[in-house]
Swiss-Prot record:
It comes from the Bacteria. A lipid is attached at C23 (N-palmitoyl cysteine). Residues 1-22 form the signal peptide. It comes from Staphylococcus aureus (strain MSSA476). This is Uncharacterized lipoprotein SAS0074. It is found in: Cell membrane. Transmembrane segments: none annotated. Keywords: Cell membrane, Lipoprotein, Membrane, Palmitate, Signal.
Length: 254
């Protein structure tokens, strides 16, 4: 009798394990599918092509509003004992007017004596004409001018055709918020990792983890966000990461 109970318990545990594992794999597939709607658009070499591309629309959108694309890419590095240095750019591409404006930003975040983070962000307003980003105000710093001139968004060279091949992700899902994420360990042979290393001075040989994180309805929503992040180093006082986002919003919100 005791042996029979043990067998029943083992079988029950086995079914429970399979069920939980199946749920995890199902949620991973849902998260991938949610991101795939946007990531399948990468790469978009000519950003002005986005004027003719429509994102997810729901009943929150005005029928006359064609929406606005928001693009953001940034690289962040922090050595021990130093500030977290961030450089990036954000563009707002209005499909109604077919005009684009935004800014290039440089930030240095360091904790004060009480441990509170203090930002020191500088913004340089820009606009885009004929797929070229140009400053709208005079910039005296030649390095900043060069950085703006040479800047490329990840959406212009990133490629996620192999997204379906990423396996065994660390999955997190909170239906209450709702927020969700999937994290994958990459190798330095990954196409996107190679592209980042070609464009940025990344002071580590460690292969990054890819984090897909978002909020809102997994099946689609005009609210919330979807971000991707390549985390090379994440330690106390030392961080190296690259983040990117491509969002489609109501024009009145931006």
């Amino acid at each position: 009798m005791k042996r029979l109970k043990k067998i029943v318990l083992c079988i029950s545990f086995l079914f429970l394990t399979i069920f939980i594992g199946g749920c995890g794999m199902g949620k991973e597939a849902e998260i991938k599918k949610s991101f795939e709607k946007t990531l399948s658009m990468y790469p978009i070499k000519n950003l002005e092509d986005l004027y003719d591309k429509e994102g997810y629309r729901d009943d929150q959108f005005d029928k006359k509003d064609k929406g606005t694309w928001i693009i953001n890419s940034e690289m962040a590095t922090q050595n021990k004992g130093e500030a977290l240095k961030i450089k990036g750019m954000v563009l707002y591409m209005n499909r109604n007017t077919k005009t684009t404006k935004g800014y290039y930003y440089v930030n240095a975040i360091k904790n004060d004596k009480d441990g509170r983070p203090q930002e020191n962000e500088k913004r340089y307003p820009v606009k885009m004409i004929d797929n070229k980003v140009i400053p709208t105000k005079e910039i005296k710093d030649e390095n900043i001018k060069t950085e703006i001139k040479n800047f490329k968004f990840f959406v212009q060279y990133g490629n996620f055709k192999d997204l379906k091949n990423y396996k065994d992700g660390d999955i997190s899902y909170n239906p209450e918020a709702p927020i969700y994420s999937a994290k994958y360990q990459l190798t330095n042979d990954d196409y996107n990792v190679k592209q980042l290393r070609e464009r940025y001075d990344i002071p580590t040989n460690k292969a990054p983890k890819l984090l897909l994180k978002g909020s809102g309805n997994l099946k689609g929503s005009s609210v919330g966000y979807k971000n991707i992040e390549f985390t090379f180093v994440e330690e106390k006082g030392k961080n190296i990461y690259f983040s990117d986002s491509l969002d489609y919003k109501k024009s009145g919100e931006v």
